[in-house]
A protein has these predicted regions:
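FIC/Doc superfamily catalytic core
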Residues: 1-127
């Protein structure tokens, strides 16, 4: 079973901003906070990111932040990249890590099938 720990402790809000700014720059898109979602998402992230949680909960936190839309563009890509980076904290073969990165990216983006979501849950709970 994958341990409960502060998966996002090394990702302060400034790093979330940097991730989004980098993605926007690569795509020549406007990097700007939204008036509706930015402050709420920032407060949620800052109150949650140091907390110990299951990997499934950390991925769900990223999914929820994507849905809250703190930035004008690339919210999904921003939080999916952060979620995929958590996979590097696991001792996995390169093939398993690639599969898991793909799964968490799809979950955060909201495009994972029920089967993919179940596969991720089972992976996180296996001995």
């Amino acid at each position: 079973v994958i341990q409960t720990k502060p998966w996002l402790a090394e990702v302060p809000w400034d790093l979330v901003i940097f991730q989004n700014a980098s993605l926007c720059k690569q795509k020549n898109a406007l990097h700007k906070p939204t008036s509706d979602g930015y402050e709420t998402t920032k407060a949620f992230w800052e109150s949650s990111q140091q907390q110990p949680m299951k990997l499934t909960e950390a991925v769900d936190l990223c999914r929820r932040c994507h849905r809250m839309a703190p930035f004008c563009f690339y919210n999904g890509n921003t939080f999916a990249a952060i979620a995929r980076s958590m996979v590097s904290q696991l001792d996995l073969s390169e093939a398993d890590a690639a599969i898991l990165r793909s799964l968490v990216g799809h979950i955060v983006a909201g495009v994972a099938t029920p089967e993919q979501q179940e596969a991720f849950r089972r992976f996180c709970e296996k001995d």
